[in-house]
From Swiss-Prot:
UniProt cross-references to Pfam families, sorted A to Z: MMR_HSR1
Species of the source: Polynucleobacter necessarius subsp. necessarius (strain STIR1)
Ranges where the EngB-type G domain occurs: 23-211
Function description: Necessary for normal cell division and for the maintenance of normal septation.
GO CC annotation, single: cytosol
Record's keyword terms, sorted: Cell cycle, Cell division, GTP-binding, Magnesium, Metal-binding, Nucleotide-binding, Septation
SUPFAM superfamilies for the chain: P-loop containing nucleoside triphosphate hydrolases
InterPro entries reported in the protein's UniProt record: G_ENGB_dom, GTP-bd, GTP-bd_ribosome_bio_YsxC, P-loop_NTPase
Cofactor: Mg(2+)
Protein name: Probable GTP-binding protein EngB
Family: Belongs to the TRAFAC class TrmE-Era-EngA-EngB-Septin-like GTPase superfamily. EngB GTPase family.
Length: 221
């Protein structure tokens, strides 16, 4: 059973000053409104309504924290970031969201990686690129879930995955010529509806959150 199955709602904040004062590791989920972010969190945690999934874009307007527990011991956090790119909000709200996201991504020390949900039918948009550009300088990894891949045929899936991986290479400072396989920015196909790519995504998140713990166990043994 995945450790993600033990997720429970912890807290919600609308200002980085009120983020949990804890040394525990965090993995954040980000993405455009209606890209399937909440659905991805729910299916990975094997829960129907842990993160609120709505057909109305822009419903996630705060930073929502979900704690991962072993019995009553809090081990780590999953973080649901506000969806971006929703047009029907005023300028002041958009500015607040942008500031909230950029400050969190660039300054949160406990954040060990970002899962970026991208609609496979749209590919990486300008706003997705902005998220990547904010986070890449931290040196921490980004893993792209190409959501709703069940809407594409096999050929389209292959082409989309190859194109996105090549696009991500351009942002990796370890690949100055934009060629080669990026270790910091990775991508996979994913579908919450058809449960495609769950194991790969789960393994990535678990590795980020508990890698140090695993390494310590190996050294001890």
């Amino acid at each position: 059973m995945s450790k993600l199955f033990q997720a429970r709602f912890a807290t919600t904040v609308n200002d980085t000053h009120y983020l949990p004062a804890t040394p525990l590791r965090e993995v954040a989920f980000a993405g455009r409104s209606n890209a399937g972010k909440s659905s991805a969190i729910n299916v990975l945690c094997n829960q129907k309504r842990l993160a609120f999934a709505s057909k109305t874009p822009g419903r996630t307007q705060h930073i929502n924290y979900f704690g991962l527990f072993a019995k009553d011991d809090l081990l780590a956090y999953l973080v649901d970031l506000p969806g971006y790119g929703y047009a029907a909000v005023n300028h002041e709200t958009k500015y607040h969201w942008n500031t909230l996201l950029s400050d969190y991504l660039q300054e949160r020390e406990q954040l060990v990686g970002v899962v970026l949900i991208v609609d496979s039918r749209r590919g990486i948009t300008d706003l997705d690129e902005q998220m990547i550009e904010w986070f890449v300088p931290t040196g921490k990894p980004t893993h792209v879930l190409l959501s709703k891949c069940d809407k594409l045929n096999k050929s389209e899936c292959k082409h989309t995955l190859e194109a996105v991986r090549k696009q991500l290479q351009q942002y990796d400072p370890a690949l100055p010529d934009g060629n080669g396989e990026s270790k910091q920015l990775t991508a996979q196909l994913f579908s919450s509806t058809k449960r495609i790519g769950l194991e790969e995504a789960d393994n990535t998140v678990i590795k980020w959150l508990f890698e140090a713990e695993t390494n310590e166990d190996e050294i001890t043994n």
